[in-house]
Protein backbone atom coordinates (compact mmCIF):
# COMPACT_ATOMS: atom_id res chain seq x y z
CA UNK A 1 0.00 0.00 0.00
CA UNK A 2 1.24 3.48 -0.83
CA UNK A 3 1.97 5.93 1.97
CA UNK A 4 -0.57 8.74 1.94
CA UNK A 5 0.70 12.32 1.74
CA UNK A 6 -1.19 15.60 1.91
CA UNK A 7 -0.27 19.28 1.56
CA UNK A 8 -2.00 21.83 3.78
CA UNK A 9 -1.82 24.99 5.86
CA UNK A 10 -1.06 25.01 9.60
CA UNK A 11 -4.07 26.53 11.39
CA UNK A 12 -2.99 25.88 15.00
CA UNK A 13 0.28 25.18 16.82
CA UNK A 14 -0.89 25.65 20.41
CA UNK A 15 -0.17 22.04 21.45
CA UNK A 16 3.26 20.67 22.30
CA UNK A 17 4.77 18.76 19.33
CA UNK A 18 1.40 18.81 17.52
CA UNK A 19 -0.02 21.03 14.78
CA UNK A 20 -3.45 21.15 13.16
CA UNK A 21 -3.23 21.14 9.36
CA UNK A 22 -6.17 22.13 7.12
CA UNK A 23 -6.16 20.25 3.81
CA UNK A 24 -8.36 21.37 0.89
CA UNK A 25 -9.78 18.93 -1.63
CA UNK A 26 -11.49 20.07 -4.83
CA UNK A 27 -13.96 17.85 -6.66
CA UNK A 28 -16.91 18.38 -8.99
CA UNK A 29 -20.41 18.14 -7.56
CA UNK A 30 -21.91 14.82 -8.74
CA UNK A 31 -25.10 16.39 -10.14
CA UNK A 32 -24.31 20.01 -10.96
CA UNK A 33 -20.65 19.80 -11.94
CA UNK A 34 -19.53 22.87 -9.98
CA UNK A 35 -16.11 22.53 -8.32
CA UNK A 36 -16.70 22.19 -4.57
CA UNK A 37 -13.90 22.92 -2.08
CA UNK A 38 -13.96 20.78 1.06
CA UNK A 39 -11.59 21.34 4.00
CA UNK A 40 -10.53 18.65 6.44
CA UNK A 41 -8.34 19.13 9.52
CA UNK A 42 -5.64 16.66 10.53
CA UNK A 43 -3.55 16.64 13.72
CA UNK A 44 0.09 16.05 12.80
CA UNK A 45 3.24 15.35 14.83
CA UNK A 46 5.85 18.15 14.78
CA UNK A 47 8.84 16.84 16.76
CA UNK A 48 10.89 20.09 16.91
CA UNK A 49 7.94 22.51 17.19
CA UNK A 50 9.16 24.28 14.03
CA UNK A 51 5.79 24.96 12.36
CA UNK A 52 4.07 28.31 12.75
CA UNK A 53 0.49 29.25 11.88
CA UNK A 54 0.12 29.90 8.17
CA UNK A 55 3.01 27.64 7.08
CA UNK A 56 2.46 25.38 4.08
CA UNK A 57 3.49 21.85 5.08
CA UNK A 58 3.57 18.30 3.70
CA UNK A 59 2.24 15.61 6.04
CA UNK A 60 2.52 11.83 5.83
CA UNK A 61 0.39 9.09 7.34
CA UNK A 62 2.03 7.11 10.15
CA UNK A 63 1.14 4.72 12.96
CA UNK A 64 -1.25 6.06 15.62
CA UNK A 65 0.67 8.38 17.95
CA UNK A 66 -2.30 9.27 20.17
CA UNK A 67 -6.10 9.06 20.19
CA UNK A 68 -6.48 11.49 17.26
CA UNK A 69 -2.96 11.89 15.81
CA UNK A 70 -2.05 9.68 12.83
CA UNK A 71 0.01 12.06 10.65
CA UNK A 72 3.50 13.57 10.88
CA UNK A 73 5.04 16.66 9.30
CA UNK A 74 7.62 15.69 6.64
CA UNK A 75 8.78 19.17 5.62
CA UNK A 76 7.81 22.82 5.68
CA UNK A 77 7.31 23.93 2.08
CA UNK A 78 6.99 27.66 2.78
CA UNK A 79 6.92 29.80 5.91
CA UNK A 80 4.24 32.36 6.64
CA UNK A 81 5.30 35.98 6.42
UniProtKB/Swiss-Prot annotation:
The keyword Transferase does not apply. It holds the Pfam family Ribosomal_S17. GO terms for biological process: translation. Gene3D superfamilies: Nucleic acid-binding proteins. GO terms for cellular component: cytosolic small ribosomal subunit. CDD domains: Ribosomal_uS17. GO terms for molecular function: rRNA binding; structural constituent of ribosome. Keywords: Ribonucleoprotein, Ribosomal protein, RNA-binding, rRNA-binding. NCBIfam families: PRK05610.1, uS17_bact. Part of the 30S ribosomal subunit. One of the primary rRNA binding proteins, it binds specifically to the 5'-end of 16S ribosomal RNA. This is Small ribosomal subunit protein uS17. It comes from Synechocystis sp. (strain ATCC 27184 / PCC 6803 / Kazusa). The gene is rpsQ.
